[in-house]
């Protein structure tokens, strides 16, 4: 079954497009079989060609595959929270999810704050509003469920007791330059340390909400597919001197606590920074290894996937090559807006957030981000790499309520 599934995914559709869905997640555990089996060859061929699968890292984690459900391209739920709430569960993983997501606009908070203390006061106010709005939504949908408006959900799900209320963030990178006590982006250690303080603070506050409302809350690196552009555009109109990504052009905010998209071509330099940030989220977060084109060999894809899992603690990652599709010639490696064989215009595919879409269809902000993006050079990925030493700021277990 696995072989047939992967072969279908590798083949793509009739025009050579990769399938955007489903997005399979493969668990990389300490006993993962890295031998040159037929299924491994197919898995990493699919990874090298289309970047389809996600990889969940359990090698440097205290979690087991049964502790997590990956709901989509971004949402990962820690089922240990359900055990703490209910005293145990059987099969609850298929009955969980998120009732809603609220994304906090960090650059605006930093821009308006007088100092770091004022930043946290303003952040708390926004988080309080987010938590209360999620509680109102939960109460509303539960009422509608009980009144019979969602009969199929009622039949198969039963209720929303095992669903999380999710709070996320956008623009940690731009919050640094807008903060008058920092004036530096996430490429600087001072802002990285500030980001750690912010994420820890948000986790602690979510724990308070769990006790206050009696519901499950989690912290997510929200994809912000349209939010990253929409918030930046509105902020720029209201506060002309606020700093966004790509000053002087189409404004956007960098997703969650990611580095500037044009910062480096060294994937390990980016991983070293992201490793201490992404482990602080209690819900979805992902590191996309953006590649200019498909890797030349499935073994190179396997080596890179293995190296990341064995040297880093970040929980979720992808290899994301850019590819193009010609209506006549089919799949083309890399970014080729015109087919080199027949001269027709093509569709160029890359991950907009968690899934692949033609870049010609992206919103203005994401299109600008794509133009600014540096792809990673991974030619030396097969050689051993020493990751940054473990730091005290790293945490992998979520805060419970």
Task: Describe the function of each predicted region.
Residues 1-161, 182, 188-341, 345-348:
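Conserved catalytic cores of very large enzyme subunits
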Residues 182-197, 362-376:
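Short alpha-helical "patches" and their helix-cap loops
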């Amino acid at each position: 079954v696995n072989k047939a599934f992967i072969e279908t995914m590798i083949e793509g559709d009739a025009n050579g497009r990769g399938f955007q869905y489903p997005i399979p997640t493969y668990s990389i555990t300490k006993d993962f079989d890295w031998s040159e089996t037929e299924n491994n060859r197919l898995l990493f061929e699919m990874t090298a060609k289309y970047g389809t699968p996600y990889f969940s890292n359990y090698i440097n984690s205290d979690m087991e595959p049964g502790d997590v459900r990956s709901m989509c391209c971004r949402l990962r739920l820690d089922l240990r929270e359900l055990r703490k709430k209910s005293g145990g569960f059987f099969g609850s993983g298929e009955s969980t999810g998120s009732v809603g997501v609220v994304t906090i606009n960090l650059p605006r908070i930093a821009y308006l704050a007088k100092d770091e203390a004022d930043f946290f006061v303003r952040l708390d106010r926004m988080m309080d509003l987010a938590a209360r709005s999620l509680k109102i939504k939960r109460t509303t949908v539960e009422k509608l469920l009980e009144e019979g408006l969602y009969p199929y959900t009622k039949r198969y799900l039963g209720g929303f007791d095992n669903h999380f209320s999710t709070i996320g963030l956008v623009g940690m990178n731009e919050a640094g330059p807008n903060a008058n006590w920092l004036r530096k982006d996430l490429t600087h250690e001072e802002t990285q340390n500030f980001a750690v303080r912010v994420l820890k603070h948000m986790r602690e506050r979510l724990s308070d909400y769990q006790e206050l409302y009696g519901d499950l809350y989690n912290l997510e690196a929200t994809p912000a597919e349209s939010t990253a552009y929409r918030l930046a555009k509105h902020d720029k109109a209201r506060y002309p001197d606020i700093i966004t990504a790509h000053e002087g052009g189409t404004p956007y905010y960098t997703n969650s606590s990611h580095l500037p998209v044009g910062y480096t071509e060294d994937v390990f330099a980016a991983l070293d920074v992201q490793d201490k940030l992404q482990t602080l989220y209690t819900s979805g977060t992902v590191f996309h290894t953006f590649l200019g084109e498909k890797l030349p060999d499935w073994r190179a894809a396997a080596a890179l996937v293995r190296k990341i899992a064995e040297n880093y603690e970040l929980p979720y990652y992808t290899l994301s090559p850019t590819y193009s599709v010609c209506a006549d010639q089919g799949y083309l490696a890399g970014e080729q807006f015109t087919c080199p064989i027949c001269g027709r215009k093509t569709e160029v595919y890359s991950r907009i957030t968690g899934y692949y879409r033609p870049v010609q269809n992206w919103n203005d902000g994401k299109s600008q981000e794509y133009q600014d993006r540096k792809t990673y050079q991974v030619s030396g990925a097969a050689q051993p790499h020493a990751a940054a030493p473990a730091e005290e700021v790293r945490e992998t277990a979520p805060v419970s309520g």
